[in-house]
Amino acid sequence: MGALKLYHRGLELDQNQPEAWISIGNIHYYNKDNSQALRAYEKAKDLRPDHARTYNNIGTIHKENGNYPEALSNYKVAFKYDPNYALVCRNIGDVHLKDGNNLEAIDWLHKATGLDPDNLYGWYWLGRAYYRSGKIKESVGHFLRVLSRKPDLPQVHHDLGKAYFGLRKYKEAIEHVKQAMIRNPSIPHYYITLSKIYDSLHQETRALAILDTALTWNRSDPVVWIAKGDIHKQSGRMQEALKCYDMAVSFRSDHWRGYYKKGVALYYLSRLEEAKEALEEALRMKNKDAGSNHFIGMVYLAQNDPDTAFDYLYKASILDSMNADIWFHLGQGCMRLEDWSDAEKYLQRSIELNERNKEALYAIGKVYQKMNELDRSRDHLAIFKKLSDFEKDRDALLTEIRVRPTELKLYRELAIFYEQHDYVTEAAEVLRKSVYLGDKEAKEELNRLKSLIEIDQR
């Protein structure tokens, strides 16, 4: 605290020292006293209202406090006074990244890297912005650029691994996530990412074992328990999933996602009142969550209360308007209310979002029967039957792969099956897994399918 005393003594002699107030603010900031830091920066601003660095520092305090609009406002004032200030461009990009405005983040981070090409934060954040905007190939180059300069950054290895996973380059994905874990083995989400990669390769036992390793570092981490529960849930082991979700909320009673996941598992176990209780707890913590509103609506549907169900499902559809399942259940609620016109509207929206939503196809077929539009009913029910038969055969092959995840012949059969039904993208993804497992012949087939996909996209 000696430095603070010196600055304050200097200010007793001359209050008009904005740089001194900035230095005082910096000391408080590095001592994690943001409120005192903000007061000092505000003093500096009063003394020199055109100083870009002051506004940048004020913006950083607001950013750390989660007040993104106020942070952005101050950063933009800083940029107005100094348009060559690379740090403030990075900070504006970071705020947009945190707020989900990925395209704006890309623009500002490009400015930052142009002004200060040697700063690795700008390139790393730019990679993250590209990844989050769905431009995964572009993100890889930026992460590699950072690692070429500093190869020991675990978070960059992890994010590069996630990007490779998004491109279905399994070998590279696993390698880089493992590199992250070697450099910092105590970070839970590294294990979760590696577990997801192995689970996607149908290696469920290994995926669960990786999460168990994460729990040896921190047994009370709810996110890891939820990840374990999700693996059990997708394999239909709802009781095991529920145990994991229970562990999550036992360690963190304020973890809304744990209660949401618990409510979903209880719903599938037909323990409806308990499901409602868990989902209401999740909504109490996070009222504007589409998932919790969706499933509590489904609980009310199962309890034959379509009016209440509709209210929750409608709210869910506003919160997540691109979720085909929400629109399907909203249509289902209208069917229970015998509102055939709205049922058709909502079910049609579900099918627009997911043309393979067989439940919605079946439901709208029944709605058209009620509306005496028999030709349309037959058409939709025929598509439903075709999809049902396809999924039955596909699921049989997937079950065999889960039992024998390293048998290459099964992957080849599944890829052929997908291509025969014109699902070329899915066939290519299966072959990528086969290539990772060592099937040399699959590589040639994969290249052929890639060519077909490129032709189709022109």
Regions found by a protein language model. Give the residues of each.
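Canonical tetratricopeptide repeat
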Residues: 23, 57, 91, 125, ...
